[in-house]
């Protein structure tokens, strides 16, 4: 304790007994012990407070690092997502346009009574029948198919 050995402590106690006397010595020892306990408690409190402050500072630094990292990641994701969304938007617009073109082709085919072949060539019903006639079917079957197609087309017009 304080760099003092047993012999040195014994010398201090003997001097204290001689100097204070046997009546005041016990009270002086109690006061000295209370003083050292108070000093020890104060030092421990200061140490704990300092440790907490250091820990809080470390946590603050760590939090700021994570915040900066998070902000950097968010910024990089914003750029990527916007580019991807623009690409998706362009693709969707192109698909919508192609669907609208197909719808217009079908609308024109219904109005002009032609069959679209999706190769941007329109084939009339008569040409289609001529192609069918050249196949193995008999003319009677072709005529029945034409009559059925006409009836179905009329029904579709009624629904529209």
Curated annotation (Swiss-Prot):
Q: Where is this region: Disordered?
A: 118-160
Classify the protein's membrane topology as the record does.
Single-pass membrane protein
Q: Does the keyword Membrane apply?
A: yes
An MF annotation (GO) of this entry: protein transmembrane transporter activity
Which GO cellular component does the record give, naming just one? Answer: TAT protein transport complex
Q: Where in the cell is it found?
A: Cell inner membrane
- Transmembrane residue ranges: 1-21
Q: Which ranges are annotated Basic and acidic residues under compositional bias?
A: 128-140, 149-160
Highest taxon of the lineage: Bacteria
Q: Which GO terms describe its biological process?
A: protein transport by the Tat complex
Q: Does the keyword GTP-binding apply?
A: no
Q: What is its main location?
A: membrane
Keywords assigned by UniProt? Cell inner membrane, Cell membrane, Membrane, Protein transport, Translocation, Transmembrane, Transmembrane helix, Transport
Family according to the record: Belongs to the TatB family.
> What does the UniProt record say this protein does?
Part of the twin-arginine translocation (Tat) system that transports large folded proteins containing a characteristic twin-arginine motif in their signal peptide across membranes. Together with TatC, TatB is part of a receptor directly interacting with Tat signal peptides. TatB may form an oligomeric binding site that transiently accommodates folded Tat precursor proteins before their translocation.
The record's annotation in HAMAP family points to: TatB
Record's subunit section: The Tat system comprises two distinct complexes: a TatABC complex, containing multiple copies of TatA, TatB and TatC subunits, and a separate TatA complex, containing only TatA subunits. Substrates initially bind to the TatABC complex, which probably triggers association of the separate TatA complex to form the active translocon.
PANTHER family found in the cross-reference section: SEC-INDEPENDENT PROTEIN TRANSLOCASE PROTEIN TATA, CHLOROPLASTIC
Q: What is this protein called?
A: Sec-independent protein translocase protein TatB
Give the originating organism. Helicobacter pylori (strain HPAG1)
């Amino acid at each position: 304790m304080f760099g003092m050995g047993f012999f040195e402590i014994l010398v201090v106690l003997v001097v204290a007994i001689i100097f204070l006397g046997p009546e005041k010595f016990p009270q002086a020892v109690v006061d000295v012990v209370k003083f050292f306990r108070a000093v020890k408690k104060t030092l421990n409190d200061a140490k704990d407070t300092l440790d907490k402050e250091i820990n809080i500072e470390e946590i603050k630094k760590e939090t700021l690092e994570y915040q900066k990292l998070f902000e950097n990641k968010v910024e990089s994701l914003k750029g990527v997502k916007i580019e991807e969304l623009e690409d998706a938007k362009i693709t969707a617009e192109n698909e919508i346009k192609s669907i609208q073109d197909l719808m217009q082709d079908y609308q024109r085919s219904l109005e002009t009574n032609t069959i679209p072949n999706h190769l941007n060539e329109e084939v009339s019903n008569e040409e289609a029948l001529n192609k069918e006639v050249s196949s193995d079917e008999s003319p009677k079957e072709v005529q029945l198919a034409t009559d059925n197609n006409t009836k179905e087309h009329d029904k579709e017009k009624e629904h529209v």
